[in-house]
Amino acid sequence: YGLELDNSIKADQEGHLEGDKTWVVKGDYEYVSKEGK
């Protein structure tokens, strides 16, 4: 899934079930700091 919030936070995540009980999840995020970076 991916999402973008009003406060300039963006996140993407994906995952899959490996075996019976193990989730493998990968993702990334980005945001703009108060300094604008």
Curated annotation (Swiss-Prot):
Claim: Phosphoprotein is one of the keywords in the record: no
Keywords associated with the record: Cuticle
Gene Ontology MF terms: structural constituent of cuticle
PROSITE patterns cross-referenced by the UniProt entry: CHIT_BIND_RR_2
Domain Chitin-binding type R&R, first and last residues per copy: 1-37
InterPro entries: Insect_cuticle
Known function: Component of the cuticle of the larva of flesh fly.
Name of the molecule in the record: Larval cuticle protein SC4
